[in-house]
UniProtKB/Swiss-Prot annotation:
Its EC number is 5.3.1.16. It comes from Thioalkalivibrio sulfidiphilus (strain HL-EbGR7). Its main location: cytoplasm. It comes from the Bacteria. The keyword Cytoplasm applies. This is 1-(5-phosphoribosyl)-5-[(5-phosphoribosylamino)methylideneamino] imidazole-4-carboxamide isomerase. Belongs to the HisA/HisF family. Gene3D superfamilies: Aldolase class I. The lineage of its organism: Bacteria, Pseudomonadati, Pseudomonadota, Gammaproteobacteria, Chromatiales. The keyword Methyltransferase does not apply. InterPro entries: Aldolase_TIM, His_biosynth, HisA_bact_arch, Isoase_HisA-like, Isoase_HisA-like_bact, RibuloseP-bd_barrel.
């Protein structure tokens, strides 16, 4: 199982939000490229980058910084989300060297978009499903839809997505522990890799996910816990490799 450090970008800085709220952001660094380097040195095998300004505006706002990170660390596979609403943006990121592009809001509002992208860019499309109480959230988590998260995951599996990132937004950034039960439930319903996200606080969370990783959980995204020092990346990855 991969332990994937998260870099969330807002106004060119590396921040963490609580429960996805843009008005509740903690700035951890003014230099996201340096932060990426720190995770590379600690042994990161993949990086998760989100353009938060892009997620709100609907178009990339931190693409320059993301391109810089990818250029600086060409051997590090990177997945990027936030504000990706058309195939031109996908093309720009893939041309820059990004490995996977994450589709969030538009996957829910226009599901055929994911199907089109999977045909155009096979193997490079990941869907991010952010849910609360089993329902999918959209627009930077500011709205809850009527869509059931498992139904949507099964739909995107048919489209040919490379993976599904599942975030329990009631836990995200709250350091309350990962929602293992709902993550397993989703992973059991599909055959594509599921990446867990939201609420990872300490090594116990990593252990709990490792114990069920055979259900189809291939990775876990860790944010605030790395920045606040409650998880050491090298230690967490060593645990996940056992």
């Amino acid at each position: 199982m991969l332990v994937i450090p998260a870099i969330d970008l807002k106004d060119g800085k590396c921040v963490r939000l609580r429960q996805g709220r843009m008005d509740d952001a903690t700035v951890f660094s003014d230099d996201p490229v340096e932060v990426a380097g720190r995770w590379v040195e600690a042994g990161a095998r993949r990086l998760h980058i989100v353009d938060l300004d892009g997620a709100i505006s609907g178009e990339p706002r931190n693409a320059g910084i993301i391109s810089e990170i990818v250029a600086r660390y060409p051997d590090l596979p990177v997945q990027v989300g936030g504000g990706i609403r058309d195939d031109d943006t996908v093309q720009v990121y893939l041309d820059a060297g990004v490995q996977w592009v994450i589709i969030g809001t538009k996957a829910v509002s226009a599901p055929h978009f994911v199907n089109d992208l999977c045909l155009e860019f096979p193997g490079h499309i990941i869907v991010g499903l952010d849910a609360k109480d089993g329902k999918v959230a959209i627009d930077g988590w500011s709205k809850l839809s009527n869509h059931d998260v498992i139904d949507m995951a099964m739909h995107f599996e048919q489209d040919g997505v490379a993976a599904i990132i599942y975030t329990d937004i009631s836990r995200d950034g709250m350091m309350q522990g990962v929602n293992v039960e709902s993550t397993v439930k989703l992973a059991q319903a599909v055959h594509v890799p599921v990446i867990a996200s939201g609420g990872v606080t300490n090594l116990d969370d990593i252990r709990r996910l490792c114990a069920v990783s055979e259900e189809g959980i291939d990775g876990v995204i860790v944010g605030r816990a790395l920045y606040e020092g409650t998880i050491d990346l090298a230690e967490a990855q060593k645990l996940a490799d056992q």
